[in-house]
Design a protein with these regions (language model features):
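Flexible active-site lid/hinge loop adjacent to a nucleotide/diphosphate
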Residues: 2, 6-7, 12-98, 103-117
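Nucleotide phosphate-binding/pyrophosphate-handling subdomain across enzymes
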Residues: 114-189
Length: 189
């Protein structure tokens, strides 16, 4: 959704790392798409017009993990019962890392970016930190990058903020569930 289209990249070096956001639609039709690291985020009843049932939606998202090779890593939320149930039903090649979304005060102190006031962005950061450990990246470098993030236009974009009022442009949200997640991530709404 942001950055350069992967297929247009010309100078790919062997150690290049790509971060790819793939929807349940893309995963469903990506028979040969195999990752070294996979994260499944935002499990909520989305795209049911396509998948018909929540169960089918989860199965589609879980396809990302099922297609992984040996020695790959899959990161899931520790308390996500839907994915834990799917793990019981399916054999996987990857090592499953269950991520606790609790953010320590030590980590909170390193975040100098209002982008992470949003609970969902903070949860996503927790996954990034877990992958960074596996890649043996230094926290100092990770936080330097994290603290440089800018909000995307139309996606949870804070337009105005003071003590009494917060105006957010989230017109990129495609469904009620997505908008609800945003609202739940702020206090006093």
């Amino acid at each position: 959704n942001i950055g350069n289209p992967l297929l247009l990249e010309k100078n790919i070096k062997p150690k290049t790392i790509f971060v790819i956001e793939a929807s349940s639609y893309q995963i469903e039709y990506s028979k040969y798409f195999k990752t070294d690291f996979a994260i499944i985020l935002n499990i909520s009843p989305n795209h049911l017009e396509r998948h018909r049932t929540f169960k089918n939606y989860i199965k589609s998202k879980f396809g990302l993990i099922k297609s992984q090779k040996k020695n790959s890593f899959a990161f899931i939320e520790k308390n996500n019962n839907f994915l834990k149930e799917e793990l019981k039903k399916n054999k996987t090649n990857s090592k499953i890392i269950k991520v606790n979304l609790k953010i320590s005060n030590k980590i909170k102190k390193k975040i100098k970016n209002s982008y992470f006031e949003n609970k969902n962005n903070l949860n996503n950061l927790k996954f990034v930190l877990e992958i960074s450990k596996k890649l043996k990246l230094k926290n100092q470098k990770v936080f330097k990058v994290v603290n440089s993030f800018k909000e995307l236009n139309f996606r949870q974009q804070i337009l105005y903020k003071n003590k009494k009022l917060l105006i957010i442009n989230d017109s990129k949200s495609t469904n009620f569930s997505s908008s609800l997640n945003l609202l739940e991530s702020y206090k006093n709404i």
